[in-house]
Design a protein with these regions (language model features):
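Aromatic/hydrophobic pocket-lining residues that form the small-molecule binding cavity
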Residues: 247, 251, 323
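Conserved SGNH/GDSL esterase-like catalytic core that processes O-acyl groups on lipids
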Residues: 4-6, 134-241, 245, 273-282, ...
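Catalytic His-Asp segment of secreted/periplasmic serine-dependent ester chemistry enzymes
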Residues: 180, 235, 273-340
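N-terminal secretory targeting modules
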Residues: 1-118, 122-144
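Surface-exposed acidic, glycine-flexible loop patches that form ligand/cofactor-binding
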Residues: 105-108, 209-220, 256-262, 336-340
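A structural motif corresponding to the C-terminal end of an alpha-helix
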Residues: 148-159, 257-266, 289-295
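Structural recognition of the beta-strand scaffold that forms the well-ordered cores
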Residues: 114-118, 123, 160-164, 223-228, ...
Length: 340
């Protein structure tokens, strides 16, 4: 299953055609909540195909040509984990010029540099292709390749892994400004971090939490973890000192959680493009953690507030232009920290 934004699968083959049987839960979602995937060929920067999964089970032609050729194909999930699921049942390769002579080649090699991005909607690329005038969010406007996360990885020639969910935070989910600030801690990022895909387990398989697959931190070891959380928490803290302290303590605890699972990884904490009310709090939490954890290389990176001149995405989310500015700042910090 392709769960979080930008989750992908790549393969190489020799033949004329490749198809994939894909499952989803499209029938349980509105059109604007359905899953989107993109198909890339070789090292192309732009996808050859981009499509919405309209059925609960369908066969998709990934690639087709008239002559036998060697091709690398990558399927990338563009929509995020909160919405419709995407599972690959099977991939079939054929050679219609030389029947039976299709060849599945060794898979592409992973990049040496690995970065994990732990965040919310901004990390997903939520609404990055939409407009602030949009009244309803559409997964069609979600594109992680235009988020600071994948843009940062591109600048650093690194392979990204996203753990991101829109509207969720460290101590609370987003609370509308017109609502009473009652904390919503039913589905938070520290909990999600422990599982491979909690959303899939809960919403698609309807499994009990005790049966959810936990993430294998021994198998995946990034050199850097970038944490961009706090924007949703600010909807609750609202510059109230006691709430800011509550958030700071929880953020320090989160840093210990991430470091415990990734003891050899450097950490960058960051915030600021959409909301700056917790900037100093996250900076302070980072400093507090660093003081008691000298074995961890960690740095806070302040991001500038988005400028309307650069456009505004759906529900005031950052545009690609804003995300590129953020990516450059984070990439520059990573280069200094890791000598990349």
């Amino acid at each position: 299953y392709l769960g979080y934004s930008a989750t992908s699968i790549s393969f190489k083959f020799v033949g004329t055609k490749a198809t994939a049987e894909i499952v989803s839960d499209a029938s349980k979602h509105t059109e604007k909540e359905r899953a989107w995937i993109a198909i890339y060929y070789g090292q192309d920067r732009d996808p050859a195909k981009r499509l919405r999964l309209e059925q609960d089970r369908q066969t998709i032609v990934l690639f087709e040509t008239q002559q036998t050729t060697e091709q690398q194909i990558t399927i990338v999930k563009y929509s995020e984990a909160e919405y419709a699921a995407c599972g690959i049942v099977s991939i079939e390769i054929t050679d219609e010029v030389n029947p039976g002579e299709e060849i599945l080649l060794s898979p592409p090699v992973h990049k040496k540099r690995q970065i994990e991005f732990f965040g919310d909607s901004i990390t997903c690329g939520y609404g990055v292709e939409g407009d602030v005038s949009d009244e309803i969010f559409d997964t069609a406007d979600e594109n992680p390749t235009k988020s600071y996360s994948l843009l940062t990885a591109e600048l650093l020639n690194a392979e990204p892994n996203l753990v991101s969910w829109n509207g969720k935070g460290v101590i609370t989910a987003y609370i509308g400004e017109e609502e009473d600030a009652q904390i919503d801690d039913s589905w938070l990022m520290p909990m999600l971090y422990e599982y491979t895909d909690a959303g899939l387990e809960r919403d698609y398989f309807a499994n009990e939490q005790s049966d959810w697959e936990t993430w294998n931190f021994e198998e995946y070891k990034p050199q850097l973890v970038v944490i961009y959380l706090g924007t949703n928490d600010a909807s609750y803290t609202r510059d109230i000192p006691d709430r800011q302290k509550q958030f700071e303590d929880a953020y320090v605890k989160l840093l210990h959680q991430v470091h415990e699972h990734n003891p050899n990884a450097a950490i960058i904490t960051t915030i600021g493009a959409m909301d700056q009310r917790l900037n100093t709090t996250i900076d302070a939490a980072t400093a507090c953690f660093a003081k008691v954890t000298p074995d961890c290389t960690i740095r806070y990176v302040q991001l500038p507030l988005q400028d309307e001149v650069d456009g505004l995405g759906t529900y005031w989310h950052p545009t690609e232009k804003t995300n590129r500015k953020c990516a450059r700042l984070i990439a520059d910090a990573a280069k200094e920290m890791l000598q990349w």
